[in-house]
């Protein structure tokens, strides 16, 4: 938290981050509880969409998002993989609700029972077990590059494992291929030339093999990078060029917002135009980009009979774009604060405009 050199800052109740300042276990608890909220929302929304799903109306015209995502990865089809009948969708929804309760319990444990700081971790009992010493390694030292790179490495490995899971799911179970209108097994194409070239035309990708190849490559890069960050430490003097006096909780927050904002904007463009990753059968027809006060996408198909007034693709693309835009604004706000700029000086200057005087002398 930016304090502008004042060690005795009192934050308002609305500054939620202040509650977990320098309390790594509480910080973990807030993350786990947040995961529980997301998991609950996903499960509840899935069951709500399933309850109102009408097989006589195209799925993309019913304003859904959870079920289309599940259908895209081959969940909810009959044994032939050609007819979507909602099979196993209810299980996915209920499973998410159960997981949300587990996450909530873990969040409460970290918030109410476990030590506030993992550096002082002692679990439920005051003994020095090996797992407690291991937990202490995840203490938060915001201006310590060795601590931050150690934690970053674990995040990267988790992302890499998720990519492997997705690639193996497509290879063994299969995902929906709009080219044939059915679920099929997809072998990843680990052609590095294709992967490199798709950096510039990823919106036009029309091969599921290339999509899986990109995820396989990402898995390798992320796991390798994660191992590197866990194993290495700061080399040489820790200078301002490397982040000294800049690396902080607020700086890390700003970078996180930049990353999620950038991903949301990319997802918006991809969703609006690509029909391989976002099949028309589940999301509706592709969109047209328009410009008003800001960019936005509109439906190109006949909206007669569309349940929510817009296709799933339209609201999904637009919501992602605007959320991404505001995430980027949050990134700029927190990045500037992390650099030491005091926004209170701006409000003070504006409030003193009436009393400002300029004296001209010869």
Curated annotation (Swiss-Prot):
Which Pfam families has this protein been placed in?
PSII
Q: Describe its membrane topology.
A: Multi-pass membrane protein
Tell me the keywords, alphabetical order.
Answer: Chlorophyll, Chromophore, Membrane, Photosynthesis, Photosystem I, Photosystem II, Thylakoid, Transmembrane, Transmembrane helix
**Domain of life here?**
Bacteria
Q: Name one GO cellular component term.
A: photosystem I
Q: Which cofactor does it need?
A: divinyl chlorophyll a; divinyl chlorophyll b
Picking any one GO molecular function of the record gives: chlorophyll binding
Please list every transmembrane segment annotated in the UniProt record, as residue ranges: 27-47, 89-109, 150-170, 211-231, 251-271, 316-336
Where in or outside the cell it occurs: the entry states: Cellular thylakoid membrane
Protein's GO biological process: photosynthetic electron transport chain
Family membership, please give it: Belongs to the PsbB/PsbC family. IsiA/Pcb subfamily.
**Subunit-level organization:** The antenna complex consists of divinyl chlorophylls (a and b) and divinyl chlorophyll a/b binding proteins and binds more divinyl chlorophyll b than does the antenna complex from high-light-adapted Prochlorococcus.
Q: What does this protein do?
A: The antenna complex functions as a light receptor, it captures and delivers excitation energy to photosystems II and I. The Prochlorales pcb genes are not related to higher plant LHCs.
Q: Could you share any additional remarks the record makes about this protein?
A: This low-light-adapted strain contains 7 pcb genes.
Quote the protein name from its UniProt record. Divinyl chlorophyll a/b light-harvesting protein PcbF
Q: Which organism is it from?
A: Prochlorococcus marinus (strain NATL2A)
């Amino acid at each position: 938290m930016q304090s502008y050199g004042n060690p005795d800052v009192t934050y308002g109740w609305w500054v939620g981050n202040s509650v977990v300042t320098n309390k790594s276990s509480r910080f973990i608890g807030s993350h786990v509880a947040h995961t529980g909220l997301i998991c609950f929302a996903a499960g509840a929304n899935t069951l709500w969409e399933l309850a109102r799903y009408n097989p006589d109306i195209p799925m993309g015209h019913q304003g859904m998002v959870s079920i289309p995502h599940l259908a895209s990865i081959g969940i909810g089809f009959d044994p032939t993989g050609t007819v979507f009948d909602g099979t196993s969708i209810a299980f996915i929804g209920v499973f998410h609700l159960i997981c949300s309760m587990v996450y909530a319990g873990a969040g409460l444990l970290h918030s109410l029972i476990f030590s506030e700081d993992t550096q002082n971790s002692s679990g439920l009992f005051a003994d020095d077990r090996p797992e407690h010493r291991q937990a202490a390694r995840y203490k938060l030292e915001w201006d310590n590059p060795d601590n931050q790179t150690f934690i970053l490495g674990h995040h990267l490995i988790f992302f890499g494992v998720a990519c492997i899971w997705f690639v193996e799911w497509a290879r063994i179970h299969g995902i929906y291929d709009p080219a044939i209108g059915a679920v099929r097994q997809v072998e990843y194409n680990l052609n590095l030339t294709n992967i490199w070239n798709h950096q510039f035309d990823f919106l036009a990708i029309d091969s599921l093999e290339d999509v899986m190849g990109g995820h396989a490559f990402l898995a390798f890069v992320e796991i390798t990078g994660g191992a590197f960050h866990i194993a290495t430490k700061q080399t040489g003097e820790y200078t301002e060029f490397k982040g000294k006096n800049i690396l902080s909780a607020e700086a890390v927050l700003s970078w996180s917002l930049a990353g999620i904002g950038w991903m949301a904007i990319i997802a918006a463009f991809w969703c609006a135009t690509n029909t391989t990753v976002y099949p028309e059968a589940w999301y509706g027809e592709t969109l047209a980009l328009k410009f008003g006060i800001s960019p936005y996408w509109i439906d190109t198909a006949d909206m007669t009979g569309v349940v929510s007034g817009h296709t799933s693709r339209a609201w999904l693309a637009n919501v992602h774009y605007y959320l991404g835009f505001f995430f980027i604004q949050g990134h700029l706000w927190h990045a500037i604060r992390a650099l030491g700029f005091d926004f209170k000086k701006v409000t003070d200057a504006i409030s003193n405009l009436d009393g400002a005087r300029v004296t001209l002398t010869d």
